[in-house]
Amino acid sequence: MQKRRQSGFTLLEVMVVIVILGILASLVVPNLMGNKEKADQQKAVSDIVALENALDMYKLDNNRYPTTEQGLDALVNKPTAAPEPRSYRDGGYIKRLPQDPWGNPYQMLSPGQFGKIDIFSMGLDGEAGTDDDIGNWNLKDFQ
C-alpha cells in the first residue's frame, strides 16, 4: 500500500495569512478614507470655481450678480423676479447646477459676507457656519 500525500494548508498557515491580511487592511483603509475626504473637498473646490466663473459671465452680460433670492438657479434658468437680467444667454450659463459631494445644493449670497458674492458648500455636516464649510473665500485652505 502506498501512502497518499495530502496537500493543502494547515489551520495555522491559514490563520497566519488571515492575521497578515487584517494588519494590511488596518493600515490601508484609514488612508483610503482620508483620500476620499480630500477628493470630496477637491470636487467642491472645482465646482465652486466653476460656479464663480459662470456668475462672473452673468455679471458681464447683466452688470450685476443674481440676487440671493434668485440664487444659483439664475445660471440655469432666466430669473423672472426683479431685477430681471437685461441680456440673458440662450441656454443659460451652465447646463445644470451641481450638488456638492455630500448631496447638498451649493449656496450663494449676493452680496456676500466675505466678498461681492459668496458661493459655498456646507460641507460634510450640512450646516452653514461650521469649520468644514468650503467657500470661495477659503478655497486655499482646501488645496
Swiss-Prot record:
Subcellular localization, as worded in the UniProt entry: Cell inner membrane
PROSITE patterns cross-referenced by the UniProt entry: PROKAR_NTER_METHYL
Coarse class of the protein's main subcellular location: membrane
PTM section of the record: Cleaved by the prepilin peptidase.
Region described as Disordered: spans on this chain: 70-92
TM region positions: 9-29
Protein's membrane topology: Single-pass membrane protein
InterPro entries (alphabetical): Bac_GSPG_pilin, N_methyl_site, Pilin-like, T2SS_protein-GspG_C, T4P/T2SS_Core, Type2_sec_GspG
Keyword terms: Cell inner membrane, Cell membrane, Membrane, Methylation, Protein transport, Transmembrane, Transmembrane helix, Transport
Any one GO CC term of the record: plasma membrane
Propeptide: 1-8
Domain of life: Bacteria
Residues modified as N-methylphenylalanine: F9
GO BP field: protein secretion by the type II secretion system
Similarity remark: Belongs to the GSP G family.
Free-text function comment from the UniProt entry: Core component of the type II secretion system required for the energy-dependent secretion of extracellular factors such as proteases and toxins from the periplasm. Pseudopilin (pilin-like) protein that polymerizes to form the pseudopilus. Further polymerization triggers pseudopilus growth.
Complexes and interactors: Type II secretion system is composed of four main components: the outer membrane complex, the inner membrane complex, the cytoplasmic secretion ATPase and the periplasm-spanning pseudopilus. Forms homomultimers.
Protein name: Type II secretion system core protein G
UniProt source species: Aeromonas hydrophila
